[in-house]
């Protein structure tokens, strides 16, 4: 007699069946896919036993070729072979063309200013091209694992903003891949480097890949990874080393490439030289029928400025965490560019310790993402892992006078929700505009606008009576939702912030720098603006009161109040916050008796016609 398989309603008959989940390192230069098999994380190889899949997409009329085969077609057909698409994702067309003027691609802009690449297959967005890479990785994983994927953890640079993160999720959706979570690349590397070992202390993750640089400072404590601070540069990586070498080759040979195909061939030669110099002190180069020679010391000199740039970002990030290099227990090296001996040497000197390089720097991010994916699908229910990422830039709201009130400060652990109450500025105000901002400065004009929406249906009340609760919520992927609720009626409005394009490289670098450079000036400006807003509010309140109850004052009292009003109105035009503050105080003193009489009048009106027994 056959045994029956019995399960609770809605429960799988095999509840402990291993679910297939992967970690994907969607890189600028190369991409990898990894999975946990037999209890350990491993990178999945393709049919030719290769680990790295070049992030290159070649487009024909009817198909997309991804990886090595696409790379072989790059020099023959550069306009239809898209390389380093990660640099383009989440950016505006203008930003792309200004930042990368030498790209061999032609662009059209959408109505929202997003770039579309002109290809043989038609106009395609960076999201659609990224989706082709994800399709390739998904197919590879399902072939190697022997089944359909439940989902994937996809890694992104810690410095990716909301638009870039959302674009990555959109690419996965187009590829038919469920995103379990977006995970910061440095955090993924830290997981791979011993979360289960119980090690405690502060570590730095130095991630120098093909197109982006990230540094994260993490505290490890009893199975908890807390990101103390993040920094980096979205336009710094091994690709930039290649371009510097290419310029050196052109200068030495005096032969410049004449077309896109020759440019691509030159970059390929430069990349081969860079790789060879990681293990050799001297390399011979054959280019344009000339034989050149470059020493490793010359290469080190060429890239020294870029390496220094990365270390300056490290110093800024340490400062954000209130730490010094000597506080760092270990440094984890991530990204293929960290194989360069000069990079390892300079990082070691800066942090005063020998960097960790025991895990292949190309694999480490994918391996960590796979571990996280395995946990998220429930294959490791006893895991005590807890990841605490942070937001890279403060999120705030515009208040009267063009000021920014920060709701969630920079480097706050996510996921997070913060709420703050605001009120109306004018009598009878029935709507409120909510302006969502990103940045570290005190004034709206110096921060980045993320979204605007309007809360309508506020009951008409005197200024300051309504209570509007504004909630900012950032999920585990760093995406922001904002909700505004009027408390007495429950009327609400909300938005999910999906900016049409991301921050430019200059904006990312300058936002933090300018906040430090202008800190003193910004505080003075804020104090002055706050006093002006307070003064304006008081003046409007007094004029409103006079319209209703001017008869409560005699001529001398009325004259004194009006003189104080005129004086304060003049002070508002000046640049002296202390003088305005004193003017508010003088007006307050001039209206104290008036306020007392108005209060008495209100009480008499409220008690009129009531029997004393009814008054409690």
From Swiss-Prot:
Keywords: ATP-binding, Chaperone, Nucleotide-binding. The keyword Phosphoprotein does not apply. It holds the Pfam family HSP70. CDD domains: ASKHA_NBD_HSP70_HscA. The keyword Cytoplasm does not apply. One of its GO terms (molecular function) is ATP-dependent protein folding chaperone. One of its GO terms (biological process) is iron-sulfur cluster assembly. Belongs to the heat shock protein 70 family. Chaperone involved in the maturation of iron-sulfur cluster-containing proteins. Has a low intrinsic ATPase activity which is markedly stimulated by HscB. This is Chaperone protein HscA homolog. It comes from Histophilus somni (strain 2336). The gene is hscA.
């Amino acid at each position: 007699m056959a045994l029956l398989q019995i399960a609770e309603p809605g429960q799988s008959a095999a509840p402990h069946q291993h679910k297939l989940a992967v970690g994907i390192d969607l890189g600028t230069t190369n991409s990898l896919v990894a999975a946990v098999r037999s209890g350990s994380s491993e990178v999945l190889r393709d049919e030719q036993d290769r680990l790295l899949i070049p992030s290159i997409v070649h487009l024909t009329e009817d198909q997309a070729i991804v990886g090595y085969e696409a790379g072989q077609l790059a020099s023959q057909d550069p306009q239809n072979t898209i390389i380093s698409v990660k640099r383009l994702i989440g950016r505006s067309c203008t930003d792309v063309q200004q930042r990368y003027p030498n790209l061999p691609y032609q662009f059209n802009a959408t109505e929202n200013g997003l770039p579309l690449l002109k290809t043989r297959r038609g106009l395609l967005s960076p999201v659609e091209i990224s989706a082709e890479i994800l399709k390739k990785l998904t197919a590879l994983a399902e072939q190697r694992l022997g089944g359909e994927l439940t989902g994937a953890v996809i890694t992104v640079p810690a410095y990716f903003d909301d638009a870039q993160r959302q674009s990555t999720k959109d690419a996965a959706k187009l590829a038919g891949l469920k995103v379990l979570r977006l995970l910061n690349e440095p955090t993924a590397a830290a997981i791979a480097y011993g979360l289960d070992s119980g090690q405690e202390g502060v570590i730095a993750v130095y991630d120098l890949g093909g197109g982006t640089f990230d540094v994260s400072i993490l505290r490890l404590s009893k199975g908890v990874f807390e990101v103390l601070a993040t920094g980096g540069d979205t336009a710094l990586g091994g690709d930039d080393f290649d371009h510097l070498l290419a310029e050196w080759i052109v200068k030495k040979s005096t032969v410049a490439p004449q077309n896109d195909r020759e440019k691509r061939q030159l970059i390929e030669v430069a990349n081969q030289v860079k790789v060879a110099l990681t293990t050799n002190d001297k390399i011979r180069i054959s280019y344009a029928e000339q034989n050149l020679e470059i020493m490793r010391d010359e290469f080190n000199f060429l890239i020294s400025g870029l390496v220094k740039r990365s270390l300056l970002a490290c110093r800024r990030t340490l400062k954000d965490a209130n730490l010094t290099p000597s506080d760092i227990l270990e440094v984890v090296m991530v990204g293929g560019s960290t194989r360069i001996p000069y990079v390892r040497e300079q990082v070691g000197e800066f942090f005063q310790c020998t960097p960790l390089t025991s895990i292949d720097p190309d694999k480490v991010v994918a391996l960590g993402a796979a571990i996280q994916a395995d946990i998220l699908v429930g294959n490791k229910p006893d895991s005590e892992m807890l990841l605490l990422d942070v937001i890279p830039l403060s999120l705030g709201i515009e208040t009267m006078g063009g000021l920014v009130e920060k709701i969630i400060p920079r480097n706050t652990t996510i996921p997070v929700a913060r709420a703050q109450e605001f009120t109306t500025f004018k009598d009878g105000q029935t709507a409120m505009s909510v302006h969502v901002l990103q940045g570290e400065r005190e004034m709206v004009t110096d921060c980045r606008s993320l979204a605007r929406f309007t809360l309508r249906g506020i009951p008409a009340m005197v200024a300051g009576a309504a209570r509007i609760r504004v909630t900012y919520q950032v999920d585990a992927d760093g995406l922001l939702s904002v909700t505004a609720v009027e408390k007495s009626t429950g009327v609400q409005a909300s938005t999910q912030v999906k900016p049409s394009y991301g921050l430019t490289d200059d904006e990312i670098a300058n936002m933090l720098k300018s906040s430090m450079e202008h800190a003193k000036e910004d505080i003075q400006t804020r104090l002055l603006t706050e006093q002006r807003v307070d003064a304006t509010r008081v003046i409007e309140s007094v004029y409103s009161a006079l319209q209703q109850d001017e008869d409560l004052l005699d001529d001398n009292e009325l004259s004194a109040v009006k003189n104080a009003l005129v004086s304060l109105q003049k002070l508002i035009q000046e640049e002296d916050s202390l003088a305005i503050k004193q003017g508010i105080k003088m007006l307050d003193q001039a209206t104290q008796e008036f306020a007392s009489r108005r209060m008495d009048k209100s009480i008499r009106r409220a008690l009129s016609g009531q029997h004393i027994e009814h008054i409690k």
